[in-house]
Amino acid sequence: TTEVWGSSDKLKHYVNKYHPDYVFVCLGANELFVRDIITKRSRYVDNMLNQIGNIPYVWIGPPNWKKDTGINRLIASKAKPGCFFLSDGMKFDRSKDGAHPTRKSSALWMDSVARWVVLHSAHPIRLKTPMPGNAKANRVEVLQPKR
């Protein structure tokens, strides 16, 4: 959540460790129904964006399955112009829990994000379509907010 990541300096730790050229953030789905979210979460979003600093970034909004209480509005108001991708309004096939997009739907979601980054983001990057059967990461490291 923005609260977990934004109440620590772990994002800055990862920035210093990996020296990324570009940062993608995808948080907020567990905060769709937080009441008074702007008051409760603004400082955490601010802290995360301060830790990213001047590195180009895109914050990918949550894949809403119901109307949220303001998480998308909060992130959009804090992110620099062209750095927030609004996922709300997209149609997703959902897993059995009714909330998480299926793997296939998640892949289509990220395809939409990729097209948007190339054409509309504040920091477009060149992306090549992966060859079928070759669309697997060589290495995956899950970054956790707690030490």
Describe each PLM feature range.
Residues 1-43, 64-70:
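Conserved SGNH/GDSL esterase-like catalytic core that processes O-acyl groups on lipids
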